[in-house]
Swiss-Prot record:
HAMAP family: SmpB. Keywords: Cytoplasm, RNA-binding. InterPro entries: SmpB, SsrA-bd_prot, SsrA-bd_prot_CS. The lineage of its organism: Bacteria, Pseudomonadati, Pseudomonadota, Alphaproteobacteria, Acetobacterales. The keyword Phosphoprotein does not apply. This is SsrA-binding protein. Required for rescue of stalled ribosomes mediated by trans-translation. Binds to transfer-messenger RNA (tmRNA), required for stable association of tmRNA with ribosomes. tmRNA and SmpB together mimic tRNA shape, replacing the anticodon stem-loop with SmpB. tmRNA is encoded by the ssrA gene; the 2 termini fold to resemble tRNA(Ala) and it encodes a 'tag peptide', a short internal open reading frame. During trans-translation Ala-aminoacylated tmRNA acts like a tRNA, entering the A-site of stalled ribosomes, displacing the stalled mRNA. SUPFAM superfamilies: Small protein B (SmpB). Belongs to the SmpB family. One of its GO terms (biological process) is trans-translation. GO terms for molecular function: RNA binding. The keyword Cytoplasm applies. PANTHER family: SSRA-BINDING PROTEIN (PTHR30308:SF2), TMRNA-BINDING COMPONENT OF TRANS-TRANSLATION TAGGING COMPLEX (PTHR30308). GO terms for cellular component: cytosol.
């Protein structure tokens, strides 16, 4: 039996991660939201070419949007052009929007995207984190703890 052809596209699973978000922020809560994308944006995202490092979520006209998420143009011969860093609408219920806006207003938190993934049905979703910024000494402690965990695992492995 012949193997299925691998196209290099992501049908489900993580398409892009914001690794710096977990380092620069303390994540208090997470929310999963749908994201409105056009066809060429979805194709480019399925190729795993998105960047979330400068992205953030915010409110505009009572709706939540994702700003500064970079999705490069799809090079597959599609004529439709799109703004690579334009705002993208997030699909959330009103209760979730109120929860996010309340956390931003009350606690001085921010909403950062942690990852963009495709669920088992093939729909694009973004995981948002309600986050507080870390101080420099907290970042140093996180680095020291991570290094110690790595060294401890290495020592236990070599026993």
């Amino acid at each position: 039996m012949a193997e299925p052809r691998k196209s290099g596209l992501i049908s489900h699973g993580i398409a892009a991660q914001n690794r710096k978000a977990r380092f620069n922020y303390t994540i208090k809560d997470t929310v999963e939201a749908g994201i409105v994308l056009r066809g060429a944006e979805v194709k480019s995202l399925r190729m795993g070419r998105a960047t979330l490092s400068e992205a953030f979520a915010g409110e505009r006209d009572g709706e939540m949007y994702l700003f500064n998420m970079y999705i490069p143009e799809y090079q597959g011969g599609v004529l439709s052009r799109f703004d690579t860093k334009g705002p993208r609408k997030l699909l959330l219920k009103r209760k979730q929007i109120d929860q996010l806006l309340g956390a931003i207003a009350r606690q001085g938190s921010t909403v950062v995207p942690l990852d963009v993934h495709f669920n088992p049905r093939g729909l694009a979703k973004v995981t948002l984190g309600i986050a507080e910024g870390r101080k420099q000494h907290d970042k140093r402690q996180a680095i020291a703890k991570r290094d110690w965990e790595r060294d401890k695992a290495r020592i236990l492995k070599n026993r």
